[in-house]
């Protein structure tokens, strides 16, 4: 499939350029950042620091690099030349206008470090993840299928070329390790890093246990923590923090681990077909990952900062997802991969929600049912409706 696929974040990108002198767009490699900024700002000059010669010029003479270029400039993979950021500050302050620079980056840690040192208060921050199901449906029409989307994920090149995930992801992972991981860490044992990535896939939607990962991979707990931080910084995985209230209930302190893209997750688990997906012992965890990640994308694409948590206490009461992004309308969401709804799915919603202040209108179970409906306890939302919510 060819042609530009409109991204939901496009409107927010334009607003940020009206409000700030600098706009930063971060996200994983190949999520569509370069395509989006070129389409959103067609009159801007464009340079990419992936080019070794351009990167060298930026590192050796940042003053000339900035002053000799257009007032409207896109700098792709800007994290490769952190010394540019102080010069961008000087020049943007001199001009005093909005929308001067658009910076993209695949390494959030390096980008935010440079922004924090030089551009604090001058930059509008946005994140672009791979396609959401809603974006893909808008592009493909009714052909978009939830189960197929889980297996393929949302990386644009996969959908633009029709490339099989089993061909795309090995190259993606190898490139990621060579360019991003090697640039931040001394990863001498690449086999161990691959092993950790595969084990993370097996632990998805579960509590993160650094000690267990350390034993399974055969490296120190400190190394695991360092590697996980890089996976998070480069938008491969993220953690959902447990919800904490002021009550006396003992709540878990460990976060849960998720992947930003279910296609990568399924590849690491060896899942290549819908049949393998629904028969997999990991299907429930993968489905939970889908709903959590797509909820996050929805908020990010609206320019909001997601406030997502999970609930688990010592009474073994658990709610898969708490969404406080809109403080006036919080959500408590149980996530079930079943095609049939059972009342037991909502058994913790009433008691926990009464305690933490989420009303009946915010209580729901997202499942693979054919259509959404209401029960006395909660709303039962078909996954296609949850993913397609505007």
Map each language-model feature to its residues.
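Short regulatory helix/loop adjacent to the ATP-binding pocket of P-loop NTPases
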Residues: 109-124, 140
């Amino acid at each position: 499939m060819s042609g530009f696929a409109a991204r939901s974040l496009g409107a927010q990108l334009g607003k940020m350029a009206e409000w700030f002198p600098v706009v930063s767009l971060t996200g994983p490699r190949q999520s569509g950042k370069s395509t989006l900024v070129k389409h959103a700002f067609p009159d801007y000059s464009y340079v990419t620091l992936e080019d070794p010669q351009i990167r060298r010029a930026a590192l050796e003479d940042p003053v000339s690099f900035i002053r000799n270029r257009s007032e409207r400039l896109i700098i792709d993979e800007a994290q490769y030349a952190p010394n540019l950021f102080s010069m961008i500050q000087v020049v943007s302050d001199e001009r005093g206008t909005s929308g001067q620079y658009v910076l993209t980056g695949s390494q959030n840690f390096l980008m935010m470090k440079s922004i924090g040192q030089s551009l604090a208060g001058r930059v509008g921050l946005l994140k672009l993840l791979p396609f959401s199901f809603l974006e893909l449906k808008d592009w493909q029409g009714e052909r978009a299928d939830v189960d197929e989307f889980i297996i393929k994920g949302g990386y644009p090149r996969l959908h633009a070329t029709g490339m099989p995930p089993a061909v795309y992801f090995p190259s993606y992972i190898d490139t990621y390790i060579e360019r991003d991981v090697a640039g931040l860490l001394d990863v001498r044992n690449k086999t161990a890093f691959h092993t950790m990535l595969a084990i993370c896939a097996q632990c998805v939607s579960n509590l993160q246990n650094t000690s267990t990962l350390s034993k399974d991979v055969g490296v120190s707990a400190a190394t695991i923590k360092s590697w996980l931080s890089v996976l998070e910084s480069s938008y491969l995985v993220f953690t959902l923090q447990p919800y904490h209230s002021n009550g006396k209930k003992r709540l878990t302190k460990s976060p849960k681990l998720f992947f930003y893209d279910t296609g990568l997750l399924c590849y690491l688990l060896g899942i290549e077909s819908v049949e393998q997906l629904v028969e997999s012992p990991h299907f429930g965890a993968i489905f939970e990952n889908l709903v959590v990640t797509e909820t996050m994308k929805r908020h990010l694409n609206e320019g909001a900062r997601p406030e997502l948590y999970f609930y688990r206490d010592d009474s073994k009461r658990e709610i898969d997802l708490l969404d406080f992004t809109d403080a006036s309308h919080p959500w408590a969401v149980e996530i079930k991969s079943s095609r049939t709804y059972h009342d037991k799915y909502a058994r913790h919603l009433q008691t926990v929600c009464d305690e933490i202040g989420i009303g009946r209108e915010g209580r729901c179970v997202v499942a693979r049912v054919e259509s959404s409906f209401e029960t006395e306890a909660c709303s039962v939302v078909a996954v296609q409706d949850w993913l397609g919510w505007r």
